Amino acid sequence: MYKMNICNKPSNKTAPEKSVWTAPAQPSGPSPELQGQRSRRNGWSWPPHPLQIVAWLLYLFFAVIGFGILVPLLPHHWVPAGYACMGAIFAGHLVVHLTAVSIDPADANVRDKSYAGPLPIFNRSQHAHVIEDLHCNLCNVDVSARSKHCSACNKCVCGFDHHCKWLNNCVGERNYRLFLHSVASALLGVLLLVLVATYVFVEFFVNPMRLRTNRHFEVLKNHTDVWFVFLPAAPVETQAPAILALAALLILLGLLSTALLGHLLCFHIYLMWHKLTTYEYIVQHRPPQEAKGVHRELESCPPKMRPIQEMEFYMRTFRHMRPEPPGQAGPAAVNAKHSRPASPDPTPGRRDCAGPPVQVEWDRKKPLPWRSPLLLLAMWGPQAPPCLCRKRGRGACIKCERLRPRIRRRGLGPPAAAPARRRIPRTPALCTPLALPAPTTRRRQSPWTRFQWRRRAWAAPLWPPRGAGADSPRWRGRRVRPPFS
């Protein structure tokens, strides 16, 4: 079953649906571990698929009718070319087809294991997917990133494309080219055979004597209704309607096979052009009804925030991550004149894009003073500018040195400092219980928010040269309005 994580990335997890079943639930006590089906090594493993038998029967029918009946009826100067061209194509198709069926496309670590014993039954109560973190829970081996577990073969296939029922084998990285050569050779051979059958069928009504150039027909000049088949090795007498019926049946089957093989070949050419596999194409074009589970998981991921909402969310998160003494209330509105109600608080327990859910302790009754100089200075910490300008028409600038004692009295100290060259983890900073410094926080912001810092900073003539801390708002005493103030 195809799944997506809540960060909109397709996961490398494929669970069997039909061939691998889960044990029925017992009313009391855990059920004993049962054994599932065995893994199939290649296309010769038992049982054969019905479409595989149909493919072999069609190959025999085309070969017998083409080489035994139709090609010997061609004019004598065309017979050698007919045998040579069609024989080479049919022989080449047989070789690549047998090779594609015989190759084991499983992952290298799976091939190193023994196929003797059956695999355990997949239990969905213990694992959500068969492959998790590049480890197959059924094959019990580490697999590559492009490997998928085939439910029909019950094994992990490297570079999985699809399970071909005509080959009764999976098509993966090891036999994909052989599969394409098999399809192309089959299409070319059927096209030539249809052309020969059409010529014989039409020429029988136009000039049947052109079909009787073989030396065996010289003794039957007065019996035009008698024909020979399987020339020249084992001539067998037959009637004209039988040859016409076989030629018409071959034309119909050949046209049907040409349409199917041509569509399949064009489809795989399209996939190669776009560098996709059949599995990836099916997943991308899966109808929306089958992706309801994915949408339900995506609902828990917060939507993309605007820059102002992003700053507010950072401030709330820093407040949550900073330990406070028990019994002490959170920061209230420091300056109601310069405060503004915040956006609605996120739902407690909402899961972010990675990591455990963040429980934000926020009082809905108290507005968030998101423009308060105290909170801005507390969030910036040592990276704050020397002066904080109020909104236009609302008083002069406020020096940060006068605000720092008020910050310490109200318990709005800056977050814990981190090393300057700290390596930022791949998970978002909001999902970790560690407080990151202000420059790290700004690097985590959106490009639009970072642009606001640079736009105001470059307006100052005393902007320091670009270096390790060039993104931080250091203005060397300049009274510049900070963003969102």
UniProtKB/Swiss-Prot annotation:
Residues 475-485 have a biased composition (Basic residues). GO terms for biological process: antiviral innate immune response; positive regulation of defense response to virus by host; positive regulation of NLRP3 inflammasome complex assembly; protein palmitoylation; protein targeting to membrane. This is Palmitoyltransferase ZDHHC1. Residues 1-52, 99-185, 263-485 are cytoplasmic. Residues 134-184 form the DHHC domain. Interacts with STING1; ZDHHC1 constitutively interacts with STING1 and in presence of DNA viruses activates it by promoting its cGAMP-induced oligomerization and the recruitment of downstream signaling components. It is a multi-pass membrane protein. InterPro entries: Palmitoyltrfase_DHHC, PFA4/ZDH16/20/ERF2-like. It is found in: Endosome membrane; Endoplasmic reticulum membrane; Golgi apparatus. Residues 1-271 are annotated as: Mediates interaction with STING1. Belongs to the DHHC palmitoyltransferase family. The active site is at 164 (s-palmitoyl cysteine intermediate). Residues 74-77, 207-241 are lumenal. GO terms for cellular component: endoplasmic reticulum; endoplasmic reticulum membrane; endosome membrane; extracellular exosome; Golgi apparatus. It holds the Pfam family DHHC. The chain crosses the membrane at residues 53-73, 78-98, 186-206, 242-262. Keywords: Acyltransferase, Endoplasmic reticulum, Endosome, Golgi apparatus, Lipoprotein, Membrane, Palmitate, Transferase, Transmembrane, Transmembrane helix. The DHHC domain is required for palmitoyltransferase activity. Its EC number is 2.3.1.225. The gene is ZDHHC1. The keyword Membrane applies.
